[in-house]
Amino acid sequence: MKIRASVRKICEKCRLIRRRGRIIVICSNPKHKQRQG
């Protein structure tokens, strides 16, 4: 999980989700997991 100021989709399978007021990227590739901090 990377915590970044700006999250973006890295590949086609990345999905942007809003959870508890935070924007999260989930993907089949675990390296692409991101959270906005």
Swiss-Prot record:
Classification via SUPFAM superfamilies: Ribosomal protein L36 (SSF57840)
UniProt subcellular location: Plastid, Chloroplast
Cellular component GO terms held in the UniProt record: chloroplast; ribonucleoprotein complex; ribosome
Plastid is among the record's keywords: yes
GO biological process: translation
Keywords from the named record: Chloroplast, Plastid, Ribonucleoprotein, Ribosomal protein
InterPro entries reported in the protein's UniProt record: Ribosomal_bL36 (IPR000473), Ribosomal_bL36_sp (IPR035977)
Pfam family, one: Ribosomal_L36
GO molecular function: structural constituent of ribosome
Domain of life (superkingdom): Eukaryota
Family: Belongs to the bacterial ribosomal protein bL36 family.
Protein name: Large ribosomal subunit protein bL36c
Gene that this polypeptide is encoded by: rpl36
